[in-house]
Each structure stands twice: as structure tokens, then as C-alpha cells.
Amino acid sequence: MISVNDFKTGLTIEVDNGIWQVMEFQHVKPGKGAAFVRSKLRNLRTGAIQEKTFRAGEKVAKAHIENRRMQYLYASGDTHTFMDNETYEQLELQTAQIEYELKFLKENMEVHVISYESETLGVEVPNTVILEVVETEPGIKGDTASGGTKPATLETGLTVQVPFFVNQGDKLVIDTRSASYVSRA
């Protein structure tokens, strides 16, 4: 059991018969009444996001998540195959389980596969990935003064807003948490 006062971003807990990951939390001490913790939780099974309020000092069960390093091998229809780097055991996941992460997955990429009590919940990609621009409008000289952006389609199919100086074929650093451009690689 863990106290809600000890919440940290990324902590996994068991609440209401579900496995939840703490995305955000805030300790609130109103002038009148008892303190409480307002939190934003993501269900690791369904991906649903829920806001929940706990009384300060309330105890919740900590979920012990197994985190295995695996390599993304290939996609075949709606099935995506991963391989454990130590045992060479292969694992297949459905598109619905890793829909968001697919925007960042390239073949042979190292990822963390998370599971709870032998049930695979999903995939955790690195915070940043390097992806190549496959389609974008050419930058026109003089456009940079405004500091604007233009859409660019990356090799995984993800479309992000990038500065005007980015061209087709450039490799970019992309933040996987916000699906946004960070810098050139």
C-alpha cells in the first residue's frame, strides 16, 4: 500500500479494479476543510483517462508492473511482433493495444513492453525518437522571419508541425509524449 501523499508521475496503482498510471497530481489544501490530492490517471488496459480525487493520507495498492526490454521486429496486418533481447522469445500485440505508440515505432527499435501478472498491457516508447521527414512543402526564402510552422509527414505516418527550414529527408527529434517537433537530429 502507498499513501496518495507519495504520488509521483508515472506511478502505477490499483484502484476500482483497474491498473492506473498517475499522469498528473496536485496536493490541495483548502482554507476550510481537509486536504486532498487531485489526480489525473490513465488506465493501462483501456487507455482511458480519468480524473480522481483522494483524501490526503488515503492508502491505495501499488501495482507491480513488469517492464521488459524488447525490440520491435515487424507488422503483419493488425499484429505487431516484438522480441525479447535476452531470451529471443517473440511476443505479438494487436494494433488496438499500441495504437498511440505506433506513430513512433520503427523496425528494430528498442522499447519497453509493460505487463501486469503475465497480462501484456502495452508498449512504452522512449521519450524522444528520431524520425525522417518523407513529405513537406519546401521552405521559401524569407519565410523564417515570421517564425511560423508548416506540416511535415514523417516515415511512420505521423504529421507534426515543423519550422520552415525543415526539408524532406531531414531527420528530426520528436517528443513522444506530446507528438511534437523538438529539433533536428
From Swiss-Prot:
Location of the protein in the cell: Cytoplasm
The source's superkingdom equals Bacteria
Associated pathway: Protein biosynthesis; polypeptide chain elongation
Decide whether keyword Cytoplasm is in the record. yes
Is Nucleotide-binding tagged as a keyword? Answer: no
NCBIfam families referenced in this protein's UniProt entry, alphabetically: efp (TIGR00038), PRK00529.1 (NF001810)
Q: HAMAP family this protein is in? A: EF_P
**Free-text function comment from the UniProt entry:** Involved in peptide bond synthesis. Stimulates efficient translation and peptide-bond synthesis on native or reconstituted 70S ribosomes in vitro. Probably functions indirectly by altering the affinity of the ribosome for aminoacyl-tRNA, thus increasing their reactivity as acceptors for peptidyl transferase.
**Record protein name field:** Elongation factor P
The organism encoding this protein is Shouchella clausii (strain KSM-K16)
